[in-house]
Each structure stands twice: as C-alpha cells, then as structure tokens.
C-alpha cells in the first residue's frame, strides 16, 4: 500500500506539470486562435537558458527571474516577428509556421547545448519526506505545491483583475467584447 501511495503522489506531481502545460496551450488558443506547436520547445529552450545561468554561478532565484524575463522577451519577439504576420492566414499556414518554430527551437538548442540530456538542479532538498511508513520525494511534494500556487495565481488573475476579466470576456464572446 505504501508503494501505491508513493506512486500516486509521484503521478500527481508529473500530472500537475502536464496540466499546467495543457492550461497554457488552452489559454493561448483562447486568446489568439493559434495552437502553438512550438510551445514545448520554447519551454525547453527557456529551461536550457536557466540551466546555463545556474552553471555560470547565478543563484537559483536570480536564474529563475532572469529566465522569466528572457522567455517573456523571446515570446514577444516570436509573436511579433513570426506569428503576427500570419495571423489572418489560413489555419494550415499557421500550423506550418508553429511546426517550423518547433524545429528551429529544437535544432538551435541541440546546436548550442547538444542533444544529450542535462541534469537540472532541484530547488527542493534531496532528503525524502516521511509520513508514517511512507516516504515521499521532496521534489514531488514541491512540484505539487508549486503547481497549486501557480494555478491559484492564474485563477485569481482571471477572476479579480481587469485584464483577466477582459481576457475571459474576449475568449467567451470576441464580437461582444470588441464593442465594450
């Protein structure tokens, strides 16, 4: 029974990451009507940027903030230079562009960092958390808490901020939201 509970917690941690990525895909699609097939590769590229900063001696939270800034700027550049020019194009054109971005990000990351997996340091301690006779990886517990915190922040953003409410209105009824 202990192993089953450990595996459930580990599965929840991994599933939380997949759920967050799926939520990001849905949010982008609702806002732009574009399915970004390169989203995973863009996240991988940002992770490698963080890994590079950590290996250069930047503290963990400094690398985290630096990665967020660089990923945001990179996303803005990709949206303005690559996605926006094909915004009104047929859907197949947009799919081809995002698939092209996928290949480009993957190839550039492989060229810079090679195609060998790299170990990424965890911000959580390596010692397991013990609850009775059951041991949980602190990384799994940390992933679950971080995912819940991020989801709560996203929920509050869309529920209580003017920008979040406007984005919900635009996603629900684009024509009516343009009139307001």
Where in the sequence are the language-model features?
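Small-residue-rich transmembrane alpha-helical segments that form helix-helix packing/gating elements
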Residues: 1-32, 37-170, 178
């Amino acid at each position: 029974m202990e192993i089953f509970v450990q595996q459930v917690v580990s599965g929840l941690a991994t599933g939380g990451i997949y759920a967050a990525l799926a939520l990001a895909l849905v949010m982008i699609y609702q806002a732009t009507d574009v399915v970004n097939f390169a989203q995973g590769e863009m996240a991988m590229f940002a992770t490698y940027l963080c890994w590079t900063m950590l290996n250069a001696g930047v503290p963990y939270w400094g690398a985290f903030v630096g990665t967020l800034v660089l990923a945001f700027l990179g996303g803005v550049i990709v949206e303005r230079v690559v996605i926006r020019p094909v915004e009104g194009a047929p859907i197949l054109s947009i799919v081809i562009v995002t698939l092209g971005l996928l290949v480009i990000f993957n190839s550039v990351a492989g060229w810079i960092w090679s195609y060998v997996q790299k170990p990424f340091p965890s911000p959580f301690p390596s010692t397991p958390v013990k609850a009775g006779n059951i041991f949980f990886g602190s990384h799994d517990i940390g992933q679950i808490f971080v995912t819940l915190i991020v989801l709560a922040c996203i929920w509050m953003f869309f529920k209580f901020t003017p920008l979040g409410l406007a984005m919900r209105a635009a996603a629900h009824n684009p024509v009516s939201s343009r009139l307001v």
